[in-house]
């Protein structure tokens, strides 16, 4: 259980400090979602159908994030967040 909390704090640290590239931010966000899922499953808080719904929504969120990343790279040529202000 302590390992999950340590990973959660590390994931939050990476998410808050990664402000240059959108890909690193999306990967750290997915890492946090998977840690939240493992925490909920470990504590027996979710039933099996709720776990599948949670994972389905997470996959849809990841696909939308990747589509935003691809459109950003096609329009600006880079995944750096500083190009979003232009």
Curated annotation (Swiss-Prot):
InterPro entries: NUOK/Mnh_C1-like. Its EC number is 7.1.1.2. The chain crosses the membrane at residues 22-42, 52-72. Its main location: mitochondrion. It is a multi-pass membrane protein. GO terms for molecular function: NADH dehydrogenase (ubiquinone) activity. It comes from the Eukaryota. This is NADH-ubiquinone oxidoreductase chain 4L. It comes from Artemia salina (Brine shrimp).
